[in-house]
Amino acid sequence: WSAGKQFTQRIAYSTDGGETLHKIDKSVLPTVCKENRDPKVFWHEKSGAYIMTLWLEENDFGIFRSTDLLKWEQTDRLTFKEAWECPDLVCLKDEKGNETWMFWSADGFYFWGEFDGYQFQTDGVRHAAYINKIAYAAQTYSNTGNRVISVPWLRFPNRGRNYTGAM
């Protein structure tokens, strides 16, 4: 269904608490790379902007920012060896309110660093959250206070069923 088509990033919004969604008919972000996909958008209070992480190609990811969700500017391009797809950028706070940021990729690799609303600075040391390849493409919820809630897709065959894996 997507063969030969460019990947685009689009927006749907709700004015009634999510009961109905209204789609914006055009792409809000020009195609950066042929198959760029898997956007994750969150509000970054300190810089007063929405932030989007996006898989670009191979081991490359982009960070974009917008104040209105319609016009986006790329502010960073990151390359992490052996990491790909489904990026997430998460702020973790300790008991004293000190922040550290974690950049996450689909395969459970993550990188510690600092984020200023424009760029993610890291030492590049890759950490692995999983000991096997069952969990994949975890994403976190926004607006959960100081809690970080992450839900992965658990990839395993369900023979005789019309689905694969579980969330």
Question: What would you call each of these model-derived segments?
Answer:
Residues 1-167:
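Carbohydrate-active catalytic/glycan-binding domains of CAZyme proteins
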